[in-house]
């Protein structure tokens, strides 16, 4: 997924449909959006918002309702915002000379609000842009969107690991991958530790170099796929946990950054939003990083680790596959890459 809407549209549910009778686009949902104060931040205004300013503005909603794995990522650079009294919607605008001559708003993730406020917040957003679309949303959010005229398709699933009961040491039966990862780190003299602002600053050049090497090793290596796997930030970010792996020569071998997931003002789990390793030298290091982080989170009483979107996986398990063309495209993508 990227800023090319030819790609984005294949992964989103675009509700804009033909209406030969000329009826209002709200006809499909008979409940009009209530009038409420809203704030729209786009363009230069959005670009000028730093992390601290975004946190001050949006964290009251995020800390109460940021329960999804990519909720925290709505604070990242490049997002624009529709903010109401009950919550906010983060989105990006895309444009294409043929497919979207006018900028098209692609809402990123579930709206950040209480479940009961979701319909009205979405209606209010659509009241200002009926061409908007949504991507990487949960099934409860999809259930709200479908009566409004959206088509919805499953694009994958998010693996959720129960932190308190999961065997982070592995075994040679069901969890041999974990055991092998643990053994690899021991043989390689790998040390994994959580780093804070000072440690990140000291290792910034190494972290950036490893990140660039990781991107270069991928099939799509000319840009970051930043919407559902955000760009790494090698500075302090409120609530984000950052674990770094070092080889026996004390060089950076990999890192994993975990975004907090919030419920009712408290962190109940984390999402593995950024994981990058020297895969040529340490093929199982990402697993070892996750297990080390989970042990720390377990001691703190956290509940869940979200490994985030596995694109095109378990498509038939999704409740919604409204567009057969999109479903076929996703299945072909899963098969042929």
Predicted regions and their residues:
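Glycine-rich phosphate-binding "P-loop"
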Residues: 105-115
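Inter-domain linker/hinge segments that demarcate the starts of reverse transcriptase
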Residues: 121-122
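Short active-site oxyanion
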Residues: 129-133
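Acidic, Ser/Thr-rich peripheral helices and adjacent loops at domain boundaries
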Residues: 317-337
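An acidic, glycine-rich, mixed-charge low-complexity segment common to nucleic-acid enzymes
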Residues: 9-29
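A conserved beta-strand-loop-helix scaffold within acyl/acetyltransferase catalytic domains
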Residues: 41-106, 135-155, 166-180, 184-323
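Short hydrophobic short-linear motifs embedded
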Residues: 11, 38-43
């Amino acid at each position: 997924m990227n800023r090319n809407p030819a790609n984005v549209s294949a992964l989103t549910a675009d509700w804009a449909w033909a209406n030969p009778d000329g009826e209002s686009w709200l006809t499909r949902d008979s409940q009009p959006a209530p009038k409420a104060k809203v704030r729209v931040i786009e363009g230069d205004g959005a670009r000028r918002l730093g992390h601290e300013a975004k946190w001050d503005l949006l964290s009251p909603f995020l800390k109460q309702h940021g329960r999804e794995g990519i909720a925290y990522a709505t604070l990242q650079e490049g997002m624009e915002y529709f903010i109401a009294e009950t919550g906010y919607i983060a989105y990006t605008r895309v444009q294409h000379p043929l497919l979207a001559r006018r900028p098209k708003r692609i809402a990123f993730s579930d709206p950040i609000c209480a479940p009961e406020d979701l319909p009205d917040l979405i209606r209010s957003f659509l009241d200002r842009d009926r061409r908007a679309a949504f991507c990487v949303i949960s099934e409860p959010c999809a259930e709200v969107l479908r009566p409004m005229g959206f088509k919805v398709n499953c694009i994958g699933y998010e693996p959720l690991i129960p932190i308190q009961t999961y065997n982070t040491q592995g075994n040679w039966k069901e969890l041999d991958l974990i055991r092998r990862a643990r053994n690899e780190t021991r043989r390689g003299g790998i040390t994994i530790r959580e780093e804070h602002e000072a440690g990140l600053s000291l290792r910034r050049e190494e972290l950036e170099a490893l990140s660039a090497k990781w991107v270069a090793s991928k099939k799509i290596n000319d840009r970051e796929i930043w919407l559902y796997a955000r760009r790494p930030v090698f500075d302090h970010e409120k609530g984000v946990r950052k674990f770094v792996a070092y080889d026996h020569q004390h060089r950076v071998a990999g890192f994993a950054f975990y975004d907090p997931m919030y419920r009712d003002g408290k962190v109940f789990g984390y999402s593995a939003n950024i994981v990058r390793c020297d895969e040529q030298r340490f093929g199982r290091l990402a697993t070892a990083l996750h297990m080390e982080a989970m042990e720390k989170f377990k001691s703190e009483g956290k509940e869940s680790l979200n490994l985030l979107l596995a694109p095109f996986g378990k498509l038939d398990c999704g409740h919604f596959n409204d567009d057969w063309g999109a479903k076929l495209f996703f299945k072909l993508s899963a098969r042929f890459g």
